[in-house]
Regions:
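Basic helix-turn-helix/winged-helix DNA-binding cores
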Residues: 1-61
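Short, charged amphipathic alpha-helical surface segments
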Residues: 65-127
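Conserved class I S-adenosyl-L-methionine
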Residues: 132-179
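Class I SAM-dependent methyltransferase SAM/SAH-binding core
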Residues: 185-189, 193-236
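A short acidic, Gly/Pro-enriched loop at the edge of an enzyme's catalytic core
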Residues: 235-247
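A short glycine-rich, Lys/Arg-flanked "PGG" loop and its adjoining helix->strand segment in the class I
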Residues: 262-274
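C-terminal alpha-helical "lid/dimerization" subdomain adjacent to the S-adenosyl-L-methionine
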Residues: 280-335
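Core SAM-dependent methyltransferase catalytic element
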Residues: 327-349
């Protein structure tokens, strides 16, 4: 189709289409001889995605990066729609936090009878820090490229440092702890290739899942055709409030900073039903002293390469994780399963 027909279908001007073309967000083919732009159905959905993301406040550069990630993986209508939905959920969660902050400011002014600039500034700064923590995450592990070999990587036996030691047994222990029941609905947060989702589903529960990597999701869906798997992040679960009886996550939170982990736990809280359950199996140290002692022992034995690998990730401080869960209204407990993996289980009070 020509540019005028494209503009009519999308309810935008030809000038807007040319602008997005100049920015490299859409690249229509040129007709032989005439040089006129020829748009395809793929171009329609690509531009529709751009328009939607612009309407909810995403920058041109961020859209360009997201589209590039899609281009590197599997394209098509489904992925454009998933991208739109993921970002809309992200924006919704962010706006919900803005509403919460504003309501807290109003309540404080009503309570104190006058405006305290320092107090309001503190609330605004806290909101800003949370927003920055959500937006600063970068996939420096390149999970789309890891997807093809991920299952082999986590299950193969190896000598020396092995953060995925007893991987299968860890997942089994998590499933036993969260104890899915037929008729329940659960969420596998950061599902990866869907190994945990498969185990949860085998217990008879209805399972949903999300991951930020399209390639990981592709493999999850191949293993779990009955699972509702969505594109999403730990900062904005692509599901509505109070939907799940339990949330489970494995080997995912160590890709988030401590501040980002708290945001992820708050999202777990948001999507859980009253008395909901949360189970986390991930790389952790008991507390700061445990971490320091372990790294010093590695240093004394000359294993500087292991120290570098640990410090490249964000192994959790279990004591801080438990404190954050308590603050969110959970009753948490924890146990250590392997050298680096701990299992945290929590129930809403």
């Amino acid at each position: 189709m020509h540019i005028k027909e494209m503009a009519r279908r999308l309810q935008i001007t030809p000038r807007a289409i040319r602008f997005y073309e100049e920015k490299g967000l859409v690249t229509p083919k040129k007709a032989d001889g005439s040089g006129y732009r020829q748009f395809t159905e793929e171009d329609v959905w690509r531009l529709q995605t751009v328009i939607t993301l612009r309407e909810v406040g995403m920058s041109i550069e961020d859209i360009r990066q997201l589209l590039r990630q899609l281009d590197e993986g599997e394209g098509g209508l489904l992925h454009y729609l998933e991208l739109q939905l993921s970002f809309v959920y992200d924006r919704w969660v962010e706006l919900s936090k803005v509403i919460h902050t504003t309501e807290a400011m109003i309540a404080r002014v009503k309570r104190d009878g006058e405006s305290d600039p320092a107090s309001l500034f503190e609330l605004a700064e806290a909101s800003k820090r949370l927003r920055l923590a959500r937006s600063n995450w970068v996939d420096r592990w390149n999970f789309n490229q890891l997807a093809a070999d991920y299952d082999k990587m986590v299950t193969e036996s190896r000598e020396g440092f092995n953060p995925h030691e007893r991987y299968e047994q860890v997942l089994d222990a998590l499933v036993e702890k969260v104890a899915p029941q037929p008729g329940e609905t659960g969420l596998d947060a950061g599902t990866g290739t869907g190994n945990l989702a498969r185990r949860l589903r085998e217990r008879g529960a209805t399972i949903c899942a999300f991951d930020q990597s399209p390639e990981m999701l592709k493999r999850c869906r191949q293993k779990n055709p009955g699972v509702e798997a969505k594109l999403g992040t730990f900062f904005a679960f692509p599901f509505l409030d109070s939907r799940f009886d339990f949330v489970a996550t494995s080997y995912a939170l160590h890709h988030l900073t401590d501040e980002q982990k708290v945001l992820a736990l708050a999202e777990c809280r948001r999507v859980l039903k009253p008395a909901g359950r949360l189970a986390i199996a991930d790389l952790m140290f008991t507390d700061a002293d445990h971490r320091a002692q372990h790294l010093e022992a590695l240093r004394q034995s000359g294993q500087t390469d292991v120290i570098e690998r640990i410090e490249y990730e964000y192994y959790a401080d279990r004591s801080r994780l438990l404190a954050a869960l308590e603050e969110l209204g959970f009753q948490p407990e924890a146990e250590q399963l392997t050298t680096y993996v701990h299992l945290v289980f929590a129930r809403l009070a």
